[in-house]
Amino acid sequence: LSIYKFSFKISILSAFATLFLGCFAYQPQHSSSVLFSFITPNLRISDAGFIHKYTNQTQIQIYNSGALVLNLKLAENICINGVCSDYQSFNIKYLRSTHYDEILDNIISKIPIYDGANLQKTNCGFEQNIANKMIKYEVCDNLVKFIDSKNMVKIIIRELQ
């Protein structure tokens, strides 16, 4: 009988620890509210939402009239509204080019793209004009603009205060 009591106590303790630590593990390291525009020939979204940065993933949630219209997760794979693919497949389908895998995460994180090619510092951030790819990328304080004229792709992120 005492073994059953001990097992029961361990089970309860394990369940509590799993529940508590499980919820704790998914807390974002950083969250920001944004106006997010993602305009491509295959997808057109421009609404308000959130960017959540976790240890091993980035998540973008965009809402329209209180309903989730875009749930984009960047981790080992990239998932859009629950449908996952590898980065190259996503880049070809939505960015219409075989960019390197981390380009979308770099844009969201305000990091220079293409190893800082043609990087020009500005008074509020930096800009890059990559002529051979017809890309203009600009980071200025709380505004990020990625415009790929060749492939008709625009990503604009304005962080809200």
Feature annotation, model-predicted:
Residues 24-26:
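Bacterial signal peptide processing site
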Residues 29, 52-54, 76-79, 152-161:
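Beta-strand-dominated lipid-handling architectures at cellular/organellar boundaries
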Residues 82, 91-161:
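Mature, soluble, non-transmembrane domains
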Residues 56-102:
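An acidic-aromatic
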Residues 19-22:
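C-terminal motif of bacterial Sec signal peptides marking the signal peptidase cleavage site
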Residues 31-32, 39-73:
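Post-signal-peptide N-terminal segment of Sec-exported extracytoplasmic proteins
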Residues 1-12:
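Bacterial N-terminal signal peptides that target proteins for export
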Residues 28-40, 145-147, 153:
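Terminal targeting/leader modules
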